[in-house]
């Protein structure tokens, strides 16, 4: 029952992808391939990164600091609502949260995939098997083993669900 630091901070990562990530991973791989350091890939939509200062962050919405939201329920709610409102790929803003001695910068969401891009993702030769590092049965896989994806996203605003944070509010099929 407490607010944890951003996974970006606790993991020590230079860059994190949020959302479904297919487009972001290609953009990042291409940048790395031409020699751009991960810590300098600050321009890809659908990513988050650490910044020591805001000199290279131009337009953004500031939310209350981690320290404040972890100790003030009203500040937490306000920060969540700002994050929720900015999940639209077309109008969503870059979010900045002070976090200790620096800032967590969350770029605006990535655009939804086109129909052809989405078809290409689901045409990949998935095995429907767990990663080889798992040696024991994973009960949660039984439920989805033979599932079909008919669409992504959800326009609902259910209080108990975070699907829009993962797949967005735009229905893609």
Briefly describe each language-model feature range.
Residues 85-173:
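Radical SAM [4Fe-4S] cluster-binding motif and immediate context
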């Amino acid at each position: 029952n407490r607010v944890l630091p951003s996974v970006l901070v606790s993991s020590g990562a230079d860059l994190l992808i949020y959302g479904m990530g297919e487009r972001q991973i290609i953009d990042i791989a291409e940048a790395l391939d031409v020699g751009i350091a991960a810590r300098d890939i600050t321009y890809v939509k659908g990513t988050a990164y650490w910044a020591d200062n805001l000199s290279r962050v131009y337009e953004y919405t500031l939310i209350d600091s981690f320290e404040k939201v972890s100790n003030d329920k009203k500040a937490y709610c306000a920060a969540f609502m700002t994050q929720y409102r900015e999940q639209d790929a077309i109008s969503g803003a870059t979010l900045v949260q002070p976090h200790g001695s620096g800032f967590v910068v969350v770029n605006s969401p990535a655009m939804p995939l086109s129909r052809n891009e989405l078809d290409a993702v689901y045409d990949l030769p998935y095995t429907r098997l767990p990663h080889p590092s798992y040696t024991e049965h994973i009960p949660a896989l039984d439920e989805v083993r033979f599932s079909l994806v008919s669409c992504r996203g959800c326009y609902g605003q259910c209080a108990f669900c975070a699907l829009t944070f993962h797949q967005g509010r735009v229905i893609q099929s």
